[in-house]
Amino acid sequence: MPHTPDLDAAVATLARGGVIAYPTEAVWGLGCDPRQEDAVLRLLEIKRRPVDKGVIVVASGLDVLQDWIDIAALGSEQLTAVLAQWPGPHTWILPVTAQAPRWVTGDHDGLAVRISAHPVVAALCKAWGAPLVSTSANLAGEPPARSRAALDPALLARIDGVLDGEVGGLAQPTPIRDARTGQILRD
């Protein structure tokens, strides 16, 4: 995705603590700046999702997460497995440092991270230059939207912006796997 005024507007919205909708690999997502507690709590309130569940973050690279993830806690084989699938449609639970905020990790001792190859997500992460929350654009318990037209109007009324684009070709949201144990948490 080329750098566009819509991308600039999305970044500006994130910078002021706003919540945006954007297409991901399989469904539309909601995003905000995970470093801003108020933004994350507002996003979770919009979705009716409890904070203890935690959220996925997407990023342009692990470098923007260095204060939150403890890569040294992974063995070389574990790290190789993670890096072999990025950028791509794979979410990994990574070990965290003490600086990882609870409003992002929830009641978990790991952080769900994806380095996406989806053109909109990748461009947004690059332009933003920081981690970004990525959670499905739906109310908790409802099916996620697979197109902009399917976004709940009540949800759209409560967010601050939409970055247009198409979802990728995945039939289901990205799989989630724990890098420490290899356990598949969502297939």
UniProtKB/Swiss-Prot annotation:
Keywords per UniProt: ATP-binding, Cytoplasm, Nucleotide-binding, Nucleotidyltransferase, Transferase, tRNA processing
A GO molecular function held by the record: double-stranded RNA binding
PROSITE patterns: YRDC
Compartments it resides in: Cytoplasm
SUPFAM superfamilies: YrdC/RibB
Disulfide bridge map: none
Residue ranges occupied by any YrdC-like domain in the UniProt entry: 4-187
Catalyses which reaction(s): L-threonine + hydrogencarbonate + ATP = L-threonylcarbamoyladenylate + diphosphate + H2O
UniProt-listed Enzyme Commission number(s): 2.7.7.87
Keyword Nucleotide-binding in record: yes
Top EC class of this enzyme: transferase
GO biological process terms on file: regulation of translational fidelity; tRNA threonylcarbamoyladenosine modification
Origin: domain of life: Bacteria
GO cellular component labels: cytoplasm
One Pfam family of this chain: Sua5_yciO_yrdC
Family: Belongs to the SUA5 family. TsaC subfamily.
Purpose: Required for the formation of a threonylcarbamoyl group on adenosine at position 37 (t(6)A37) in tRNAs that read codons beginning with adenine. Catalyzes the conversion of L-threonine, HCO(3)(-)/CO(2) and ATP to give threonylcarbamoyl-AMP (TC-AMP) as the acyladenylate intermediate, with the release of diphosphate.
Entry protein name: Threonylcarbamoyl-AMP synthase
